A protein has these predicted regions:
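PAPS-dependent sulfotransferase catalytic core
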Residues: 1-75
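Alpha-helical hinge/cap motifs
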Residues: 12-13, 121, 210
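PAPS-dependent sulfotransferase catalytic domain
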Residues: 84-181, 189-205
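Flexible, charged surface loops at secondary-structure boundaries
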Residues: 71-79, 108-112
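A structural signal for short, well-ordered beta-strand segments and their strand-loop junctions
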Residues: 4-7, 28-34, 80-83, 115-120, ...
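C-terminal accessory extensions appended to soluble enzyme cores
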Residues: 202-214
Length: 214
């Protein structure tokens, strides 16, 4: 069973991906997390990994062709928890002047990944969260103080808000038009009870809390 996480960005996909990888490995399953499929992979002894070397830079990230990515996916023998963020496809299409053909890529993903996790969030909250990020230049909060410091009124860019609403709608169509065996993972439900959500996703009777005694 391979898992593919689909995201527009800003819906907890990185947390879901890491939590799922930890959950599966704690359950005694050997899973790898190369993170994003579209911005740098490598295949070592038929093991698909994230591209990491001294030469890695942002100019490199989209240099791998879709055909090359498909080939690595088809050759990989390890169990995977991977991600596709729709914005990477948008950026790649811009970089390659809309010449890349993603039809085969989607076909390969649907064959290689048994279950596609479709990250969802209330569209208003999604657009508002991004509007606050746009206003404050703060992508995430990492402690209680940072959260308290953000408790104030602010004006947001209405046009930016509408743009994010439109992007979320496009993301929903993109997911449903190109992927099969979809499982929706709600942002709020996952944060409230991740163990329960991960059980529902995998079917395993396992809790991370029992492994780490927390």
């Amino acid at each position: 069973m391979n898992y593919l996480i689909l995201t527009p960005d800003g819906v907890g996909s990185t947390y879901l991906q890491r939590a799922l990888t930890v959950y599966l490995n704690c359950a005694g399953k050997d899973y790898y997390n190369p993170h994003e499929l579209l911005n740098g992979l490598q295949l070592k002894n038929d093991i698909l990994l994230r591209k990491q070397d001294a030469s890695y830079n942002w100019l490199y990230e989209y240099s791998q062709t879709v055909e090359n990515i498909c080939s690595m996916l088809q050759q990989a023998k390890n169990k995977l928890v991977c991600r596709i963020a729709k914005y990477h496809i948008t950026r790649r299409l811009q970089q390659y002047d809309h010449t890349e053909d993603y039809e085969k890529f989607y076909q390969v993903c649907n064959k290689v990944f048994d279950k596609k996790l479709f990250c969802t969030r209330d569209p208003f909250e999604y657009a508002m969260s991004w509007s606050i990020r746009n206003k404050t230049d703060m992508l995430n909060m990492y402690n209680v103080k940072e959260r308290k410091d953000m408790h104030f009124s602010m004006d947001v860019d209405v046009n930016f808000f509408k743009q994010k609403l439109s992007e979320y709608g496009a993301y929903e169509f993109w997911v449903k038009d190109n992927f099969t065996n979809l499982v929706a993972v709600d942002y709020d439900k996952f944060h409230y009870n991740p163990d329960n959500e991960l059980h529902n996703i995998t079917g395993y009777e396992h809790a991370v809390t029992s492994k780490f005694d927390i």
